[in-house]
Regions:
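Short amphipathic alpha-helical signal-transduction/dimerization elements
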Residues: 38, 136, 140, 144, ...
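Hydrophobic ligand-binding cavity/cleft-lining segments
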Residues: 4-57
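Glycine-rich portal/gate segments that line the openings of hydrophobic small-molecule binding cavities
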Residues: 51-95, 146, 150
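Hydrophobic pocket/interface hotspot
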Residues: 30-34, 40, 62, 115-117, ...
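Short, surface-exposed coil-to-beta transition loops
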Residues: 17-18, 72-76, 98-101
Length: 152
């Protein structure tokens, strides 16, 4: 019974990544950088390709290719866009059972803001998690830093 309860708890708790940074750039500048999906391969470590599949003023569907240590995967998200404030991501396709999260940009002044990045995810199976989990966690954990460096 304890193993069963433990198993249920493992199923409920998804891996999470949360990062926050205070940066000397406006919320608008940081929002524009994060929303510029097509530029990701130029500065995001491990990102080998990106493309916008569909775009409207309040929503974007985009695919991102990531690769590290010989492991390559593509995932697609539908992003709800609130201009200069937030980008909320939901999984459309990829090696995940679940992937939800987003970015929040809070102005501190005209020339500074707080960036918050949060991601909850679960891979489709243990084999994919073993092969790709560490790579994805490392890439996702470094995203705030990569965008902050890009802003300079």
């Amino acid at each position: 019974m304890i193993l069963f309860v433990g198993f249920l708890l493992m199923e409920i708790v998804m891996p999470q990544i949360s990062r926050t940074a205070l940066v000397p750039y406006s919320a608008e500048q940081m929002y524009q950088l994060v929303n510029d999906v097509q530029s990701y391969p130029q500065f995001l470590p491990g990102c080998t390709g990106s493309r916008i599949l569909e775009s409207t003023p309040g929503q974007m569907t985009a695919a991102v290719d990531v690769s590290k240590a010989g492991i390559s995967k593509t995932f697609t998200t539908r992003n709800q866009l609130t201009s200069n404030q937030s980008i909320l991501m939901n999984l459309v396709d990829g090696p995940f059972k679940k992937l939800i999260g987003g970015w929040k940009f809070t102005p501190l002044s005209q020339e500074a803001c707080r960036i918050e990045f949060h991601l909850d995810f679960e891979f489709t199976n243990k084999l994919i998690e073993l092969a790709f989990g560490r790579v994805f966690k490392e890439l996702a954990a470094n995203m705030v830093q990569a965008f902050t460096v890009r802003a300079k």
